[in-house]
Amino acid sequence: MLNKLIERENLSFKESYELFNMLLNESEMRIAAYLVALQTKGVTADEIAGFAKAMRDNAVKIDLGEVTDTCGTGGDGSKTINVSTAVSIILACFTKVAKHGNVSITSNSGSANVYEALGCKIPETPEDAKKSMDKTNFVFLFAQKYHPALKKIMPVRNELKVKTIFNILGPLANPANPKYQILGVNSAELCENVAFALSKVGGIKKALLVYGNGLDELTPNGTSKITEYDGKFDTYEVTPKDFGLDYSKIIPCESPDESAKRLIDVFSGKINEDRNFILMNAAAALYTSEIASDFLDGVEIAKEAIESGKVLKKLEEIRNV
């Protein structure tokens, strides 16, 4: 199949599923060759779906009921606060959240890095994860603990330090099989492709695939693209005005500790550029989870949760599990 990829031929869903399983027994050099060849060719929806299905089938299983995930592909190279972690804690005030995350590959603050910087412990086992969910409505599922089959592939990804299909796969491979998902992607064309792949992997009720002018989040300073899936596909664009918010700057973030501090500032009621960034994405997550009727409603729900102290209280609950 490597020659096929080098010739820029696309793989079918079945071939992609088989290739994933084959990579688990390949040398690091050949794994790197396959990943680079796929990335250079450009991954298709069938290839994403085949890899994602195989990754889920190889994962450690965990049943947490009907949950939501807030996750981004990463790989956008940005230096921003970890918005998806902030959003997941806000969302946990209203519904069950199983956040699937990892350490940083291409950014300054991956979700696992920031989660620990917030003073939270990553559950060691599925039993610990279930305990966290039962007590707090929230659990952080550290990708490396649920995908042991990938231990040969992770060092290759770390060494390559470039975007690969695995940047796309992480959010599609949550072992809790979320019914609702807001998923940030690192390029505009991935919105439709990843939405299609998510629908093909199965189990999803509603999802929003978002890309924000260079970010795998909705951007507070420009136009964002969304592909919405709820049994059918709909693609459209939004700006902060659609959320009742003013445009605001994105302030660079240099470390997980800085990201954690700035999230706590917002949770404590500080009104700044980070707040708009978080509110916009939280509103979209609340809409995806069918808690908010639309984006404007989502902003009001998120604001109330912050201003009433619910979000800080939720963070404290999660810290104390």
UniProtKB/Swiss-Prot annotation:
Binding site for 5-phospho-alpha-D-ribose 1-diphosphate: 72, 75-76, 80, 82-85, 99-107, 111
Gene3D superfamilies found in the cross-reference section: Nucleoside phosphorylase/phosphoribosyltransferase catalytic domain, Transferase, Pyrimidine Nucleoside Phosphorylase, Chain C
Amino-acid positions noted as binding Mg(2+) 1 in the UniProt annotation, renumbered to this chain: 84, 217
Recorded catalytic activity of this chain's protein: N-(5-phospho-beta-D-ribosyl)anthranilate + diphosphate = 5-phospho-alpha-D-ribose 1-diphosphate + anthranilate
A single Gene Ontology CC term: cytosol
Cofactor (UniProt): Mg(2+)
Residues engaged in binding Mg(2+) 2: 216-217
Pfam families (alphabetical): Glycos_trans_3N (PF02885), Glycos_transf_3 (PF00591)
Keywords on record: Amino-acid biosynthesis, Aromatic amino acid biosynthesis, Glycosyltransferase, Magnesium, Metal-binding, Transferase, Tryptophan biosynthesis
SUPFAM superfamilies with a match to the protein in the record: Nucleoside phosphorylase/phosphoribosyltransferase catalytic domain (SSF52418), Nucleoside phosphorylase/phosphoribosyltransferase N-terminal domain (SSF47648)
Pathways per UniProt: Amino-acid biosynthesis; L-tryptophan biosynthesis; L-tryptophan from chorismate: step 2/5
Residues annotated to bind anthranilate 1: 72, 102
EC number(s) stated in the UniProt entry for this protein: 2.4.2.18
Chain positions recorded as anthranilate 2 binding sites: 157
Gene Ontology terms for molecular function: anthranilate phosphoribosyltransferase activity; magnesium ion binding
InterPro entries linked to this entry: Anthranilate_Pribosyl_Tfrase, Glycosyl_Trfase_fam3, Glycosyl_Trfase_fam3_N_dom, Glycosyl_Trfase_fam3_N_dom_sf, Nuc_phospho_transferase
Highest taxon listed in the record's lineage: Archaea
Cofactor note text: Binds 2 magnesium ions per monomer.
Keyword Ion transport in annotation: no
Family (UniProt): Belongs to the anthranilate phosphoribosyltransferase family.
NCBIfam families: trpD
Summary of the function given for this chain in its UniProt record: Catalyzes the transfer of the phosphoribosyl group of 5-phosphorylribose-1-pyrophosphate (PRPP) to anthranilate to yield N-(5'-phosphoribosyl)-anthranilate (PRA).
Assembly mode: Homodimer.
UniProt-recorded name of the protein: Anthranilate phosphoribosyltransferase
Organism: Methanococcus maripaludis (strain C5 / ATCC BAA-1333)
